[in-house]
Regions:
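Structural recognition of the beta-strand scaffold that forms the well-ordered cores
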Residues: 129-133, 185-190, 218, 245-248, ...
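Beta-strand/beta-sandwich contexts
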Residues: 21-54, 106-120
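Immunoglobulin-like IPT/TIG beta-sandwich domains and homologous Ig-like subdomains
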Residues: 38-101
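Carbohydrate-interacting/catalytic domains
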Residues: 91, 104, 109-128, 179-182, ...
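Substrate-binding/active-site clefts of carbohydrate-active enzymes
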Residues: 127, 137-335, 355-362, 368, ...
Protein backbone atom coordinates (compact mmCIF):
# COMPACT_ATOMS: atom_id res chain seq x y z
CA UNK A 1 0.00 0.00 0.00
CA UNK A 2 2.78 2.41 1.00
CA UNK A 3 4.70 1.52 -2.17
CA UNK A 4 1.65 2.20 -4.29
CA UNK A 5 1.14 5.60 -2.64
CA UNK A 6 4.82 6.46 -3.20
CA UNK A 7 4.56 5.61 -6.88
CA UNK A 8 1.43 7.76 -7.18
CA UNK A 9 3.18 10.64 -5.44
CA UNK A 10 6.15 10.45 -7.79
CA UNK A 11 3.84 10.38 -10.78
CA UNK A 12 2.01 13.47 -9.41
CA UNK A 13 5.24 15.42 -8.86
CA UNK A 14 6.46 14.55 -12.34
CA UNK A 15 3.18 15.67 -13.81
CA UNK A 16 3.41 19.00 -11.96
CA UNK A 17 6.98 19.58 -13.16
CA UNK A 18 5.92 18.76 -16.69
CA UNK A 19 3.00 21.15 -16.44
CA UNK A 20 5.20 23.96 -15.07
CA UNK A 21 7.72 23.67 -17.94
CA UNK A 22 6.44 25.77 -20.83
CA UNK A 23 7.13 25.80 -24.53
CA UNK A 24 9.34 28.59 -25.91
CA UNK A 25 7.64 31.80 -27.03
CA UNK A 26 8.94 34.41 -29.48
CA UNK A 27 8.39 38.14 -28.93
CA UNK A 28 10.89 39.74 -31.31
CA UNK A 29 13.61 38.80 -33.81
CA UNK A 30 16.44 41.23 -34.59
CA UNK A 31 17.25 41.64 -37.39
CA UNK A 32 13.99 40.33 -38.87
CA UNK A 33 15.58 39.91 -42.30
CA UNK A 34 18.91 39.85 -44.12
CA UNK A 35 20.38 39.35 -47.59
CA UNK A 36 22.19 36.66 -49.51
CA UNK A 37 25.72 37.44 -50.70
CA UNK A 38 26.14 40.03 -47.95
CA UNK A 39 29.51 40.95 -46.47
CA UNK A 40 28.17 40.04 -43.03
CA UNK A 41 27.59 36.30 -43.19
CA UNK A 42 26.68 34.69 -40.89
CA UNK A 43 24.31 37.26 -39.47
CA UNK A 44 23.82 37.18 -35.71
CA UNK A 45 20.18 37.05 -34.60
CA UNK A 46 18.92 38.21 -31.22
CA UNK A 47 15.63 36.52 -30.36
CA UNK A 48 13.57 37.82 -27.44
CA UNK A 49 10.95 35.69 -25.76
CA UNK A 50 10.80 33.13 -22.96
CA UNK A 51 11.64 29.55 -22.05
CA UNK A 52 14.76 29.20 -24.21
CA UNK A 53 16.77 27.09 -21.76
CA UNK A 54 18.18 24.03 -23.49
CA UNK A 55 16.91 25.21 -26.86
CA UNK A 56 18.13 23.98 -30.20
CA UNK A 57 17.30 25.71 -33.48
CA UNK A 58 16.53 23.85 -36.68
CA UNK A 59 16.52 25.47 -40.14
CA UNK A 60 13.51 24.61 -42.29
CA UNK A 61 15.35 25.22 -45.56
CA UNK A 62 18.74 24.00 -46.68
CA UNK A 63 19.93 27.44 -47.86
CA UNK A 64 20.64 28.50 -44.28
CA UNK A 65 22.67 26.99 -41.47
CA UNK A 66 22.51 27.74 -37.75
CA UNK A 67 25.38 27.76 -35.25
CA UNK A 68 26.78 29.36 -32.08
CA UNK A 69 23.65 29.32 -29.95
CA UNK A 70 23.79 31.28 -26.71
CA UNK A 71 20.99 31.61 -24.16
CA UNK A 72 21.08 34.20 -21.38
CA UNK A 73 20.68 33.22 -17.74
CA UNK A 74 17.01 34.17 -17.64
CA UNK A 75 16.32 32.10 -20.77
CA UNK A 76 14.60 35.16 -22.28
CA UNK A 77 17.11 35.84 -25.05
CA UNK A 78 18.66 33.57 -27.62
CA UNK A 79 21.65 34.53 -29.77
CA UNK A 80 22.30 32.48 -32.90
CA UNK A 81 24.34 32.81 -36.08
CA UNK A 82 22.60 32.24 -39.41
CA UNK A 83 24.77 31.52 -42.43
CA UNK A 84 23.02 32.24 -45.72
CA UNK A 85 23.90 30.54 -48.99
CA UNK A 86 24.88 33.07 -51.67
CA UNK A 87 22.35 31.34 -53.91
CA UNK A 88 19.43 31.74 -51.51
CA UNK A 89 16.48 33.48 -53.11
CA UNK A 90 14.36 36.13 -51.37
CA UNK A 91 11.56 34.71 -49.28
CA UNK A 92 10.59 33.32 -45.89
CA UNK A 93 13.13 31.15 -44.08
CA UNK A 94 11.54 30.29 -40.73
CA UNK A 95 13.59 28.58 -38.04
CA UNK A 96 12.23 26.08 -35.54
CA UNK A 97 13.24 26.49 -31.91
CA UNK A 98 12.81 23.34 -29.87
CA UNK A 99 13.11 22.52 -26.18
CA UNK A 100 11.98 19.50 -24.17
CA UNK A 101 8.75 21.41 -23.50
CA UNK A 102 7.75 22.29 -27.01
CA UNK A 103 8.44 24.18 -30.21
CA UNK A 104 8.04 27.65 -31.65
CA UNK A 105 8.81 29.30 -34.98
CA UNK A 106 11.35 32.09 -35.41
CA UNK A 107 10.25 34.16 -38.41
CA UNK A 108 13.10 35.24 -40.70
CA UNK A 109 13.28 36.54 -44.25
CA UNK A 110 15.84 36.95 -46.98
CA UNK A 111 15.18 40.22 -48.78
CA UNK A 112 16.00 41.20 -52.37
CA UNK A 113 18.94 43.58 -52.71
CA UNK A 114 18.15 47.19 -53.59
CA UNK A 115 19.75 48.62 -56.72
CA UNK A 116 23.14 50.06 -55.67
CA UNK A 117 23.22 52.39 -58.67
CA UNK A 118 20.31 54.44 -57.31
CA UNK A 119 20.67 53.83 -53.57
CA UNK A 120 23.42 54.17 -50.94
CA UNK A 121 24.83 57.14 -52.90
CA UNK A 122 26.88 58.74 -50.16
CA UNK A 123 27.33 62.43 -49.40
CA UNK A 124 30.11 64.79 -50.46
CA UNK A 125 30.89 68.46 -50.98
CA UNK A 126 28.55 68.55 -53.99
CA UNK A 127 25.68 68.21 -51.53
CA UNK A 128 23.79 70.65 -49.34
CA UNK A 129 22.14 68.98 -46.35
CA UNK A 130 18.82 70.06 -44.83
CA UNK A 131 18.12 68.89 -41.27
CA UNK A 132 14.50 68.07 -40.42
CA UNK A 133 12.93 67.18 -37.09
CA UNK A 134 9.93 65.22 -38.41
CA UNK A 135 7.60 66.04 -35.51
CA UNK A 136 8.07 69.78 -36.11
CA UNK A 137 8.16 70.02 -39.91
CA UNK A 138 4.77 69.05 -41.32
CA UNK A 139 1.74 66.97 -40.38
CA UNK A 140 0.91 64.91 -43.45
CA UNK A 141 -1.14 62.18 -41.79
CA UNK A 142 -3.55 63.14 -39.00
CA UNK A 143 -4.37 59.48 -38.34
CA UNK A 144 -1.09 58.95 -36.46
CA UNK A 145 -1.27 62.09 -34.30
CA UNK A 146 -2.34 60.13 -31.21
CA UNK A 147 -1.33 56.48 -31.54
CA UNK A 148 -2.81 53.78 -29.36
CA UNK A 149 -1.46 54.07 -25.84
CA UNK A 150 -0.36 57.69 -26.19
CA UNK A 151 -2.15 59.91 -23.62
CA UNK A 152 -3.72 63.21 -24.59
CA UNK A 153 -1.10 65.25 -22.74
CA UNK A 154 1.65 63.64 -24.85
CA UNK A 155 0.13 65.07 -28.04
CA UNK A 156 -0.26 68.81 -27.65
CA UNK A 157 1.02 71.53 -29.99
CA UNK A 158 0.73 74.05 -27.16
CA UNK A 159 3.35 72.09 -25.19
CA UNK A 160 6.85 72.59 -26.58
CA UNK A 161 7.98 69.23 -25.17
CA UNK A 162 5.05 67.16 -26.46
CA UNK A 163 4.42 65.56 -29.84
CA UNK A 164 3.06 68.07 -32.37
CA UNK A 165 1.96 65.74 -35.16
CA UNK A 166 4.66 66.08 -37.79
CA UNK A 167 5.49 62.86 -39.63
CA UNK A 168 7.19 61.15 -42.55
CA UNK A 169 4.22 61.84 -44.81
CA UNK A 170 4.62 65.54 -44.08
CA UNK A 171 8.22 65.38 -45.30
CA UNK A 172 7.16 63.47 -48.43
CA UNK A 173 4.55 66.13 -49.16
CA UNK A 174 7.20 68.87 -49.20
CA UNK A 175 10.02 67.22 -51.12
CA UNK A 176 9.36 69.52 -54.07
CA UNK A 177 9.81 72.53 -51.76
CA UNK A 178 13.21 71.20 -50.72
CA UNK A 179 14.22 70.49 -54.31
CA UNK A 180 13.23 74.02 -55.35
CA UNK A 181 15.17 75.52 -52.45
CA UNK A 182 18.22 73.80 -53.92
CA UNK A 183 19.29 71.45 -51.15
CA UNK A 184 20.35 67.99 -52.28
CA UNK A 185 20.06 65.84 -49.13
CA UNK A 186 17.72 65.65 -46.16
CA UNK A 187 18.76 64.48 -42.71
CA UNK A 188 15.92 63.40 -40.44
CA UNK A 189 16.37 63.17 -36.69
CA UNK A 190 15.78 59.58 -35.50
CA UNK A 191 12.69 57.76 -36.66
CA UNK A 192 13.25 54.85 -34.24
CA UNK A 193 10.25 53.85 -32.18
CA UNK A 194 10.22 55.82 -28.91
CA UNK A 195 7.95 55.60 -25.87
CA UNK A 196 4.57 57.26 -26.45
CA UNK A 197 3.95 58.38 -22.87
CA UNK A 198 4.92 61.42 -20.83
CA UNK A 199 8.28 61.10 -19.12
CA UNK A 200 8.64 62.39 -15.57
CA UNK A 201 11.98 63.02 -13.90
CA UNK A 202 13.74 65.38 -11.53
CA UNK A 203 15.43 67.33 -14.32
CA UNK A 204 14.32 70.78 -15.56
CA UNK A 205 13.27 69.36 -18.93
CA UNK A 206 10.60 67.11 -17.42
CA UNK A 207 7.80 66.34 -17.91
CA UNK A 208 8.53 65.71 -21.57
CA UNK A 209 8.04 63.30 -24.43
CA UNK A 210 10.55 61.72 -26.78
CA UNK A 211 9.28 63.49 -29.91
CA UNK A 212 12.93 64.08 -30.85
CA UNK A 213 13.54 60.36 -31.39
CA UNK A 214 16.80 59.98 -29.44
CA UNK A 215 15.46 57.54 -26.81
CA UNK A 216 14.78 54.38 -28.80
CA UNK A 217 12.74 51.54 -27.39
CA UNK A 218 13.05 49.53 -30.61
CA UNK A 219 16.09 49.85 -32.87
CA UNK A 220 14.21 48.10 -35.67
CA UNK A 221 10.89 49.92 -35.30
CA UNK A 222 9.55 53.19 -36.73
CA UNK A 223 7.96 55.67 -34.33
CA UNK A 224 4.21 55.29 -34.79
CA UNK A 225 3.71 59.07 -34.49
CA UNK A 226 5.80 59.33 -37.66
CA UNK A 227 4.45 56.45 -39.75
CA UNK A 228 5.61 53.03 -40.83
CA UNK A 229 8.64 51.36 -42.35
CA UNK A 230 6.90 51.52 -45.70
CA UNK A 231 6.53 55.30 -45.25
CA UNK A 232 10.30 55.55 -44.73
CA UNK A 233 10.94 53.45 -47.83
CA UNK A 234 8.56 55.63 -49.82
CA UNK A 235 10.31 58.75 -48.57
CA UNK A 236 13.65 57.45 -49.82
CA UNK A 237 12.20 56.35 -53.18
CA UNK A 238 10.40 59.64 -53.76
CA UNK A 239 13.42 61.67 -52.67
CA UNK A 240 15.69 59.77 -55.05
CA UNK A 241 13.25 60.38 -57.90
CA UNK A 242 13.60 64.12 -57.26
CA UNK A 243 17.39 63.98 -57.03
CA UNK A 244 17.44 64.25 -53.24
CA UNK A 245 19.43 62.01 -50.91
CA UNK A 246 18.35 60.84 -47.45
CA UNK A 247 20.43 60.65 -44.26
CA UNK A 248 19.28 58.64 -41.24
CA UNK A 249 20.09 59.78 -37.72
CA UNK A 250 21.35 56.72 -35.85
CA UNK A 251 22.02 56.46 -32.12
CA UNK A 252 24.32 53.57 -31.23
CA UNK A 253 25.52 55.21 -28.03
CA UNK A 254 22.36 54.88 -25.96
CA UNK A 255 18.71 53.84 -25.86
CA UNK A 256 15.68 55.13 -24.00
CA UNK A 257 15.02 54.25 -20.39
CA UNK A 258 11.73 52.61 -21.43
CA UNK A 259 13.43 50.06 -23.66
CA UNK A 260 12.44 46.47 -22.73
CA UNK A 261 16.14 45.74 -22.25
CA UNK A 262 16.13 47.86 -19.11
CA UNK A 263 14.05 45.35 -17.17
CA UNK A 264 15.45 42.30 -18.91
CA UNK A 265 18.87 42.87 -20.53
CA UNK A 266 20.06 40.24 -23.00
CA UNK A 267 23.36 39.97 -21.08
CA UNK A 268 24.50 41.28 -17.68
CA UNK A 269 26.98 43.68 -19.31
CA UNK A 270 24.70 44.82 -22.16
CA UNK A 271 24.71 48.30 -20.60
CA UNK A 272 27.17 50.27 -18.53
CA UNK A 273 25.36 50.12 -15.21
CA UNK A 274 21.73 49.66 -14.32
CA UNK A 275 18.77 51.93 -13.73
CA UNK A 276 19.54 51.86 -10.00
CA UNK A 277 23.33 52.11 -10.26
CA UNK A 278 25.05 53.99 -13.07
CA UNK A 279 27.31 56.95 -13.76
CA UNK A 280 25.99 60.17 -15.26
CA UNK A 281 28.03 61.28 -18.27
CA UNK A 282 30.13 64.31 -17.22
CA UNK A 283 30.77 65.18 -20.91
CA UNK A 284 34.52 65.52 -20.35
CA UNK A 285 35.64 65.23 -23.94
CA UNK A 286 39.07 66.52 -22.96
CA UNK A 287 39.66 63.26 -21.10
CA UNK A 288 39.18 61.34 -24.33
CA UNK A 289 41.51 63.56 -26.32
CA UNK A 290 44.39 63.58 -23.87
CA UNK A 291 46.81 60.62 -23.94
CA UNK A 292 47.75 61.55 -20.37
CA UNK A 293 44.30 61.12 -18.82
CA UNK A 294 43.88 58.17 -16.49
CA UNK A 295 41.46 55.40 -17.32
CA UNK A 296 39.56 56.31 -14.15
CA UNK A 297 39.02 59.83 -15.51
CA UNK A 298 38.21 58.62 -19.01
CA UNK A 299 35.62 55.93 -18.20
CA UNK A 300 32.78 58.16 -16.90
CA UNK A 301 32.60 59.96 -20.24
CA UNK A 302 32.61 56.68 -22.16
CA UNK A 303 30.34 54.74 -19.81
CA UNK A 304 28.10 57.43 -18.32
CA UNK A 305 24.41 57.68 -19.14
CA UNK A 306 23.48 60.59 -21.38
CA UNK A 307 21.46 63.17 -19.41
CA UNK A 308 21.42 60.61 -16.58
CA UNK A 309 18.40 58.86 -18.13
CA UNK A 310 19.50 57.28 -21.40
CA UNK A 311 21.19 53.91 -20.77
CA UNK A 312 24.68 53.68 -22.24
CA UNK A 313 25.31 50.73 -24.54
CA UNK A 314 28.45 48.69 -23.89
CA UNK A 315 30.11 48.25 -27.28
CA UNK A 316 33.05 46.52 -25.61
CA UNK A 317 30.76 43.50 -25.27
CA UNK A 318 31.14 41.73 -28.63
CA UNK A 319 27.45 40.84 -28.86
CA UNK A 320 26.47 44.50 -28.41
CA UNK A 321 28.94 45.68 -31.05
CA UNK A 322 27.75 43.04 -33.51
CA UNK A 323 24.11 43.90 -32.84
CA UNK A 324 24.62 47.62 -33.45
CA UNK A 325 26.74 47.21 -36.57
CA UNK A 326 24.15 44.89 -38.08
CA UNK A 327 21.39 47.32 -37.15
CA UNK A 328 23.15 50.17 -38.96
CA UNK A 329 23.60 48.06 -42.09
CA UNK A 330 20.04 46.73 -41.93
CA UNK A 331 18.59 50.23 -42.13
CA UNK A 332 20.80 51.08 -45.09
CA UNK A 333 19.99 47.90 -46.97
CA UNK A 334 16.28 47.99 -46.14
CA UNK A 335 15.55 51.61 -47.04
CA UNK A 336 18.26 52.65 -49.52
CA UNK A 337 19.38 55.67 -47.49
CA UNK A 338 22.50 57.48 -48.64
CA UNK A 339 24.16 58.48 -45.40
CA UNK A 340 24.17 58.19 -41.63
CA UNK A 341 24.51 60.84 -38.97
CA UNK A 342 25.82 59.06 -35.86
CA UNK A 343 24.73 60.75 -32.64
CA UNK A 344 27.14 61.48 -29.75
CA UNK A 345 29.92 59.56 -31.44
CA UNK A 346 32.61 60.75 -29.06
CA UNK A 347 31.06 58.79 -26.18
CA UNK A 348 31.59 55.42 -27.86
CA UNK A 349 34.86 53.46 -28.02
CA UNK A 350 36.92 54.60 -30.97
CA UNK A 351 37.62 51.02 -32.07
CA UNK A 352 33.86 50.53 -32.39
CA UNK A 353 33.54 53.61 -34.62
CA UNK A 354 36.27 52.11 -36.81
CA UNK A 355 34.57 48.72 -37.03
CA UNK A 356 31.23 50.34 -37.83
CA UNK A 357 32.84 52.48 -40.54
CA UNK A 358 34.58 49.47 -42.06
CA UNK A 359 31.43 47.35 -42.07
CA UNK A 360 29.45 50.09 -43.80
CA UNK A 361 32.07 50.60 -46.48
CA UNK A 362 32.58 46.91 -47.13
CA UNK A 363 28.94 46.47 -48.04
CA UNK A 364 28.12 49.93 -49.41
CA UNK A 365 31.22 51.38 -51.03
CA UNK A 366 29.77 54.88 -51.48
CA UNK A 367 28.23 55.04 -48.02
CA UNK A 368 28.94 58.09 -45.85
CA UNK A 369 28.75 58.59 -42.11
CA UNK A 370 29.16 61.86 -40.22
CA UNK A 371 29.74 61.89 -36.49
CA UNK A 372 28.57 64.31 -33.86
CA UNK A 373 31.59 65.19 -31.75
CA UNK A 374 30.14 68.36 -30.28
CA UNK A 375 33.10 70.39 -29.09
CA UNK A 376 34.43 73.89 -29.88
CA UNK A 377 38.02 72.61 -30.08
CA UNK A 378 39.20 71.64 -33.58
CA UNK A 379 41.77 69.26 -32.09
CA UNK A 380 38.93 67.33 -30.47
CA UNK A 381 36.91 67.10 -33.68
CA UNK A 382 40.02 66.08 -35.65
CA UNK A 383 40.69 63.30 -33.13
CA UNK A 384 37.44 61.59 -34.15
CA UNK A 385 37.71 62.32 -37.87
CA UNK A 386 38.95 59.43 -39.96
CA UNK A 387 42.22 59.37 -41.85
CA UNK A 388 44.82 59.31 -39.10
CA UNK A 389 45.47 57.17 -36.04
CA UNK A 390 45.23 58.90 -32.69
CA UNK A 391 47.37 58.42 -29.61
CA UNK A 392 45.52 55.14 -29.04
CA UNK A 393 46.59 53.77 -32.43
CA UNK A 394 43.01 53.87 -33.73
CA UNK A 395 41.94 55.52 -36.97
CA UNK A 396 38.14 55.79 -36.73
CA UNK A 397 37.91 55.83 -40.56
CA UNK A 398 34.94 58.16 -40.08
CA UNK A 399 33.98 59.92 -43.31
CA UNK A 400 33.08 63.27 -41.76
CA UNK A 401 32.65 65.22 -38.55
CA UNK A 402 30.51 68.28 -37.93
CA UNK A 403 32.65 71.40 -37.84
CA UNK A 404 31.28 72.75 -34.57
CA UNK A 405 34.40 74.86 -33.93
CA UNK A 406 34.05 76.91 -37.13
CA UNK A 407 30.28 77.18 -36.67
CA UNK A 408 30.59 78.66 -33.19
CA UNK A 409 33.18 81.16 -34.42
CA UNK A 410 31.01 82.15 -37.39
CA UNK A 411 28.03 82.78 -35.12
CA UNK A 412 30.20 84.88 -32.80
CA UNK A 413 31.61 86.86 -35.72
CA UNK A 414 28.28 87.70 -37.30
CA UNK A 415 26.71 88.61 -33.96
CA UNK A 416 29.64 90.99 -33.37
CA UNK A 417 31.19 89.10 -30.48
CA UNK A 418 34.46 88.38 -32.30
CA UNK A 419 36.37 90.16 -35.07
CA UNK A 420 35.92 88.87 -38.59
CA UNK A 421 39.57 87.80 -38.67
CA UNK A 422 38.56 85.05 -36.21
CA UNK A 423 37.16 83.12 -39.18
CA UNK A 424 40.58 82.96 -40.78
CA UNK A 425 42.18 82.22 -37.43
CA UNK A 426 39.90 79.20 -36.94
CA UNK A 427 40.45 77.95 -40.47
CA UNK A 428 44.18 77.64 -39.88
CA UNK A 429 43.36 74.60 -37.74
CA UNK A 430 42.46 72.79 -40.94
CA UNK A 431 46.06 71.63 -40.67
CA UNK A 432 44.92 69.27 -37.90
CA UNK A 433 42.82 67.24 -40.34
CA UNK A 434 43.99 64.85 -43.00
CA UNK A 435 41.35 66.42 -45.27
CA UNK A 436 39.32 69.32 -43.88
CA UNK A 437 37.21 69.44 -47.04
CA UNK A 438 35.38 66.36 -45.71
CA UNK A 439 34.03 68.29 -42.72
CA UNK A 440 30.32 69.04 -42.52
CA UNK A 441 29.74 72.73 -41.84
CA UNK A 442 26.67 74.10 -40.09
CA UNK A 443 24.26 76.98 -40.63
CA UNK A 444 22.07 75.82 -37.74
CA UNK A 445 21.58 72.89 -35.36
CA UNK A 446 18.67 71.46 -33.39
CA UNK A 447 20.51 71.52 -30.05
CA UNK A 448 21.34 75.24 -30.04
CA UNK A 449 19.66 78.63 -30.34
CA UNK A 450 18.74 79.72 -33.82
CA UNK A 451 20.92 82.48 -35.21
CA UNK A 452 18.24 85.18 -35.25
CA UNK A 453 17.60 84.56 -31.53
CA UNK A 454 21.23 84.80 -30.45
CA UNK A 455 22.34 87.83 -28.48
CA UNK A 456 23.22 90.20 -31.31
CA UNK A 457 21.48 88.13 -33.96
CA UNK A 458 20.01 90.10 -36.87
CA UNK A 459 18.62 89.24 -40.26
CA UNK A 460 21.66 90.72 -41.99
CA UNK A 461 23.98 88.82 -39.70
CA UNK A 462 22.13 85.60 -40.51
CA UNK A 463 22.58 86.33 -44.21
CA UNK A 464 26.33 86.84 -43.88
CA UNK A 465 26.68 83.72 -41.72
CA UNK A 466 24.87 81.66 -44.35
CA UNK A 467 26.88 83.11 -47.26
CA UNK A 468 30.12 82.25 -45.47
CA UNK A 469 29.02 78.70 -44.65
CA UNK A 470 27.90 78.02 -48.22
CA UNK A 471 31.21 79.18 -49.71
CA UNK A 472 33.81 77.87 -47.28
CA UNK A 473 35.28 74.34 -47.58
CA UNK A 474 33.20 71.36 -46.50
CA UNK A 475 29.65 70.10 -47.01
CA UNK A 476 27.13 72.64 -45.69
CA UNK A 477 24.12 71.72 -43.57
CA UNK A 478 21.06 73.88 -42.92
CA UNK A 479 18.52 73.37 -40.14
CA UNK A 480 14.87 73.50 -41.18
CA UNK A 481 13.71 77.11 -41.04
CA UNK A 482 17.18 78.62 -41.49
CA UNK A 483 16.07 79.61 -44.98
CA UNK A 484 13.33 81.83 -43.51
CA UNK A 485 15.28 83.02 -40.44
CA UNK A 486 13.05 81.17 -37.99
CA UNK A 487 13.52 82.32 -34.40
CA UNK A 488 14.16 79.98 -31.49
CA UNK A 489 15.85 80.30 -28.12
CA UNK A 490 17.16 77.37 -26.10
CA UNK A 491 15.74 73.85 -26.48
CA UNK A 492 12.82 73.30 -27.01
CA UNK A 493 12.06 76.80 -28.37
CA UNK A 494 14.59 76.18 -31.15
CA UNK A 495 12.32 73.36 -32.38
CA UNK A 496 9.22 75.34 -33.27
CA UNK A 497 6.85 74.06 -35.93
CA UNK A 498 7.60 75.10 -39.50
CA UNK A 499 4.91 77.67 -40.38
CA UNK A 500 2.41 76.22 -42.80
CA UNK A 501 3.15 72.61 -42.01
CA UNK A 502 0.25 72.14 -39.61
CA UNK A 503 -3.52 72.65 -39.65
CA UNK A 504 -4.50 76.05 -38.29
CA UNK A 505 -1.17 77.76 -38.98
CA UNK A 506 -1.59 81.49 -39.49
CA UNK A 507 0.70 81.60 -42.52
CA UNK A 508 2.42 79.18 -44.88
CA UNK A 509 6.15 79.69 -45.37
CA UNK A 510 6.29 76.82 -47.86
CA UNK A 511 4.80 79.29 -50.38
CA UNK A 512 6.31 82.61 -51.44
CA UNK A 513 2.86 84.18 -51.15
CA UNK A 514 2.59 82.99 -47.56
CA UNK A 515 5.91 84.26 -46.23
CA UNK A 516 6.40 87.41 -44.25
CA UNK A 517 8.68 90.07 -45.69
CA UNK A 518 11.55 88.99 -43.46
CA UNK A 519 11.04 85.33 -44.33
CA UNK A 520 10.99 86.05 -48.05
CA UNK A 521 14.17 88.13 -47.89
CA UNK A 522 16.02 85.31 -46.14
CA UNK A 523 14.54 82.67 -48.42
CA UNK A 524 15.56 84.53 -51.60
CA UNK A 525 19.07 85.12 -50.21
CA UNK A 526 19.45 81.46 -49.23
CA UNK A 527 18.24 80.19 -52.58
CA UNK A 528 20.61 82.51 -54.47
CA UNK A 529 23.69 81.45 -52.53
CA UNK A 530 22.73 77.79 -52.81
CA UNK A 531 22.41 78.24 -56.57
CA UNK A 532 25.79 79.97 -56.72
CA UNK A 533 27.36 77.01 -54.95
CA UNK A 534 25.64 74.51 -57.22
CA UNK A 535 26.61 76.43 -60.37
CA UNK A 536 30.33 76.52 -59.57
CA UNK A 537 32.24 73.33 -58.86
CA UNK A 538 35.15 75.41 -57.63
CA UNK A 539 33.12 76.68 -54.66
CA UNK A 540 32.40 73.11 -53.68
CA UNK A 541 35.79 71.53 -54.30
CA UNK A 542 38.38 74.20 -54.99
CA UNK A 543 41.29 75.22 -52.79
CA UNK A 544 40.56 77.83 -50.12
CA UNK A 545 42.96 80.78 -50.39
CA UNK A 546 43.13 83.74 -47.97
CA UNK A 547 43.31 87.09 -49.78
CA UNK A 548 42.72 89.76 -47.13
CA UNK A 549 41.26 89.94 -43.65
CA UNK A 550 40.94 92.31 -40.71
CA UNK A 551 38.53 92.97 -37.86
CA UNK A 552 35.67 93.87 -40.22
CA UNK A 553 36.11 91.90 -43.41
CA UNK A 554 37.35 88.66 -44.91
CA UNK A 555 38.14 88.10 -48.57
CA UNK A 556 39.01 84.60 -49.76
CA UNK A 557 39.05 82.61 -52.97
CA UNK A 558 38.00 79.14 -54.04
CA UNK A 559 40.29 78.11 -56.86
CA UNK A 560 41.13 75.16 -59.07
CA UNK A 561 42.95 74.76 -62.37
CA UNK A 562 40.06 76.11 -64.42
CA UNK A 563 38.26 78.72 -62.33
CA UNK A 564 38.68 81.11 -59.42
CA UNK A 565 35.85 82.68 -57.44
CA UNK A 566 36.46 85.37 -54.85
CA UNK A 567 34.16 85.82 -51.87
CA UNK A 568 34.22 89.19 -50.08
CA UNK A 569 32.38 89.63 -46.78
CA UNK A 570 32.13 92.97 -44.96
CA UNK A 571 30.49 92.91 -41.53
CA UNK A 572 30.99 96.62 -40.89
CA UNK A 573 28.11 99.09 -40.83
CA UNK A 574 30.13 101.22 -43.25
CA UNK A 575 31.43 100.61 -46.79
CA UNK A 576 34.98 99.37 -46.82
CA UNK A 577 37.88 99.59 -49.25
CA UNK A 578 40.40 96.78 -49.26
CA UNK A 579 43.34 95.92 -51.47
CA UNK A 580 45.38 92.79 -51.89
CA UNK A 581 48.37 91.94 -54.08
CA UNK A 582 47.31 90.50 -57.42
CA UNK A 583 50.15 88.02 -57.01
CA UNK A 584 48.09 86.16 -54.39
CA UNK A 585 46.13 84.70 -57.30
CA UNK A 586 48.80 85.25 -59.98
CA UNK A 587 46.61 87.82 -61.72
CA UNK A 588 48.15 89.84 -64.53
CA UNK A 589 47.83 93.60 -64.79
CA UNK A 590 44.48 94.50 -66.31
CA UNK A 591 42.67 91.39 -65.20
CA UNK A 592 39.07 92.11 -64.32
CA UNK A 593 37.13 90.99 -61.29
CA UNK A 594 33.53 90.68 -62.39
CA UNK A 595 30.71 90.57 -59.90
CA UNK A 596 28.57 87.51 -60.37
CA UNK A 597 24.88 88.01 -61.24
CA UNK A 598 24.10 87.11 -57.66
CA UNK A 599 25.02 90.61 -56.51
CA UNK A 600 24.88 92.64 -59.71
CA UNK A 601 27.95 94.73 -58.86
CA UNK A 602 29.98 96.49 -61.52
CA UNK A 603 33.37 95.40 -62.84
CA UNK A 604 36.44 95.89 -60.66
CA UNK A 605 39.88 96.29 -62.21
CA UNK A 606 43.30 94.98 -61.18
CA UNK A 607 45.70 97.92 -61.41
CA UNK A 608 49.15 98.65 -60.08
CA UNK A 609 49.39 94.96 -59.26
CA UNK A 610 46.61 95.34 -56.69
CA UNK A 611 43.11 93.93 -56.50
CA UNK A 612 40.79 96.77 -55.54
CA UNK A 613 37.69 95.95 -53.52
CA UNK A 614 34.93 98.39 -52.65
CA UNK A 615 32.77 96.48 -50.21
CA UNK A 616 29.30 97.78 -49.36
CA UNK A 617 28.28 97.84 -45.71
CA UNK A 618 27.07 94.53 -44.26
CA UNK A 619 27.62 92.69 -47.52
CA UNK A 620 28.68 89.38 -48.98
CA UNK A 621 29.68 89.29 -52.64
CA UNK A 622 31.14 86.85 -55.13
CA UNK A 623 33.46 87.70 -58.02
CA UNK A 624 34.75 85.73 -60.94
CA UNK A 625 37.96 86.56 -62.78
CA UNK A 626 38.30 87.52 -66.41
CA UNK A 627 41.89 87.54 -67.58
Amino acid sequence: MIGALLVCALIYVGACESASAQAPTITKVEPPSWWAAHTINPVRLLVRGANFRGARVIPTRREIQVSDLRVNDAATYLFLSVRISPFARPGDYPLLIETTSGRATIPFKIEPQLDPSTNFQGINADDIIYLIMPDRFSNGDASNDAPLGSPREANDRENARAYHGGDIRGVINHLSYLRDLGVTAIWLTPWYDNWNGVNTCAHPWCPNTFYHGYAAIDYYGVEDHFGTLEDVRELVRRAHQLGLKVIQDQVANHVGSRHPWMDDPPLPDWFHGTRASHTQNPFRGDMLLSPHASEADRRPTLDGWFADEMPDMNQEEAEVARYEIQNALWWVGTTGIDGIRQDTIQYMPRFFIRELSRALHRQFQRMWMVGEANDPDAAHVAFFMGGRAGWDGVDTELDSDFDFPLWHVSEDVFTNKKPVRALRDELKYDALYVDATRLTTLVGNHDFRRFISLNGGTLRGAMLHLAFTLTVRGTPQLYYGDEIAMPGADDPDNRQDFPGGFPGDTHNAFLSSGRTGLEQRMYAWTRQWIQLRRDHTVIRKGRLIDIAFDDDAYIYARADDTETIIIAINRSLKPKKMTAPASVLNLPEGARLMSLPLTGRSILLVSNHQMQFQLPARSAEAFTISR
